[in-house]
Amino acid sequence: MDDRILTSVNLEEDSAEYNLRPQKLNEYIGQSKVKEKMDIFIRAAKKRGEALDHVLFYGPPGLGKTTLANIIAKEMGGNLKVTSGPAIERAGDLAAILTGLSEYDVLFIDEIHRLNRSVEEILYPAMEDYALDIIIGKGAAAKSIRLDLPKFTLIGATTRVGLLTAPLRDRFGVLCPMEFYNDEELKEIIVRSSSILDIDIDEDAALEIAMRSRGTPRIANRLLKRVRDYADVKGRGIVNLDSAKKALNLLEVDDEGFDSIDNKIIQAIVNNFAGGPVGIETLSYFVGEEIDTIEDVYEPYLLQKGFIMRTPRGRMATKKAYEHLKVPFNMKKNGTVNNDQCSFFKKEK
């Protein structure tokens, strides 16, 4: 289990605070482009009396994919069924889930890129024709029977859209990239959560927590609860700027929202490899983290903040990374990598 305070992976305590999640689209903070699209598509589907087309949310973890799926189910008047790619081991497991759905239900599959191929193929007729093809018998006596399914909506979520097979990706009618939240959006989320949790917090403290939350609501809510703990013991239960800073410093969350592992990645590239480029396998060895963990959990935020960039030859540190470590940046020695070049991240899959 990942016990980092800054991990965007869902922890047990995050699930326990279900009441922090908005229940309506107009209560959902951030992701304005996604909200606008989904509002139109939901209203159009309801107007025609149809199920909403299948939706794919993709982006780093902790940005609200599951919350949006729950809101969509409520807006469509159906129930939400939640599962994940690794949990569906056999085609029969998925068939049982599909046959248990009702009209306008939403089936949410997290980590959908991890579905195995035999299971994935069951989804094709289910998504296209609302039908389930079942093989009965074996050998020459085997025959295929098609069962009709209720009109449902499949919502897939993935942190690695590039790993989806083309046949599966092409069957989604709505594709929505999820973006990191800005500080003001996170501040609004923190103020809302504080009201629900009955936390006495001022705006400066809320903004301080927001700025260290890695653009991720899940992390913002987790940090809020840890700052509350500190304030209850050290600050008479009042979360102000001073108590927020002291609590976050105690948690070793710096002004950029980095923890020790983020800094290890930057330090490895700068100090051990002269700024790069360095391959992901080598970087993984030096940092002591799995490749998938670096790519899914750490890199997206470091890229978005402009501290590293990905090139065909490997990862490179930017001038901003050198400034963060207070290491001199030599243009001739370290190449021409600058913060503007990190727009490359937006073009990457």
Curated annotation (Swiss-Prot):
Region (Small ATPAse domain (RuvB-S)): 182-252
Entries under HAMAP family matching the protein: DNA_HJ_migration_RuvB (MF_00016)
Sites where the protein binds ATP: L20, R21, G62, K65, T66, T67, E128, D129, Y130, R171, Y181, R218
GO molecular function, one term: ATP hydrolysis activity
Annotated Mg(2+) binding sites: T66
GO CC terms: cytoplasm; Holliday junction resolvase complex
EC number(s) given by UniProt: 3.6.4.-
Location of region: Head domain (RuvB-H): 255-349
Compartments, as annotated in UniProt: Cytoplasm
The family this protein is said to belong to: Belongs to the RuvB family.
Chain residues that bind DNA: R310, R315
Keywords for this protein: ATP-binding, Cytoplasm, DNA damage, DNA recombination, DNA repair, DNA-binding, Hydrolase, Nucleotide-binding
Name of this protein: Holliday junction branch migration complex subunit RuvB
EC supergroup of this enzyme: hydrolase
UniProt cross-references to PANTHER family, sorted A to Z: HOLLIDAY JUNCTION BRANCH MIGRATION COMPLEX SUBUNIT RUVB, PTHR42848
Function summary: The RuvA-RuvB-RuvC complex processes Holliday junction (HJ) DNA during genetic recombination and DNA repair, while the RuvA-RuvB complex plays an important role in the rescue of blocked DNA replication forks via replication fork reversal (RFR). RuvA specifically binds to HJ cruciform DNA, conferring on it an open structure. The RuvB hexamer acts as an ATP-dependent pump, pulling dsDNA into and through the RuvAB complex. RuvB forms 2 homohexamers on either side of HJ DNA bound by 1 or 2 RuvA tetramers; 4 subunits per hexamer contact DNA at a time.
Positions of the UniProt region annotated as Large ATPase domain (RuvB-L): 1-181
